[in-house]
């Protein structure tokens, strides 16, 4: 089902995200920071992204604006996250900001169906990251959620045609 063409878009985005969370086989990816430390993040959704032939997927104004806002919010907190100094309250605030932007992206999406299908993977990882940053999984850290969001942002930059976006 297309997020962009459904009046229940936000609810469906959350349901799709929860389906990804419940998937029994989550791929384990290594996330390497420029500072040298590593941590594991579950990143099954964006691992499924593919290019549109040899080119990136189309974007619309709502998607570009929302992803820019998510990127800016994440980058503002990234130094504290990277240093291990992000507080639970800061993680909660960042998660709320990302969730608001994702809801807006989904509600206002006008992508062609194939691009929309690939966007589902980015949205799923963003929302799983939001859940983890809120402390939604006692076996995972809030930092794991931030790493998942970071991976989703990098994947968006790699697979979607957004000339202004720098991941």
Which role does the model predict for each range below?
Residues 101-120:
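Short, solvent-exposed, charged loop/turn and helix-capping segments
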Residues 71-74, 92-107:
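Short N-proximal segments of mature Sec-exported proteins
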Residues 13-24:
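Bacterial N-terminal signal peptides
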Residues 74-85, 105, 109, 130-140, ...:
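Secondary-structure edge/capping motif, primarily at the C-terminal ends of alpha-helices
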Residues 29-86, 165:
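Immediate post-signal-peptide N-terminus of mature secreted/exported proteins
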Residues 59-66, 70, 87, 91-94, ...:
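Amphipathic alpha-helix face/heptad-repeat signature
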Residues 119-167:
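Helix-rich interaction surfaces within compact, conserved domain-sized segments
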Residues 2-14:
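Bacterial N-terminal signal peptides that target proteins for export
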């Amino acid at each position: 089902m297309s997020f962009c063409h459904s009046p229940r878009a936000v609810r469906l985005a959350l349901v799709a995200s929860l389906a990804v969370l419940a998937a029994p086989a989550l791929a384990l990816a290594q996330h390497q920071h420029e500072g040298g430390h590593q941590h594991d993040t579950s990143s099954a959704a964006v691992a499924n992204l593919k290019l549109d032939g040899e080119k990136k997927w189309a974007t619309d104004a709502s998607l570009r604006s929302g992803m820019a806002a998510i990127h800016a919010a994440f980058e503002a907190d990234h130094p504290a996250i990277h240093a291990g100094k992000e507080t639970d309250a800061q993680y909660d605030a960042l998660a709320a900001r990302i969730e608001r932007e994702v809801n807006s992206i989904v509600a206002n999406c006008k992508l062609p169906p194939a691009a929309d299908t690939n966007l589902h993977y980015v949205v799923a990882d963003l929302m799983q990251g939001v859940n983890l940053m809120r402390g939604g999984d006692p076996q995972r850290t809030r930092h794991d959620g931030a790493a998942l969001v970071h991976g989703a942002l990098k994947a968006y930059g790699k697979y979607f045609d957004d000339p202004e976006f720098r991941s």
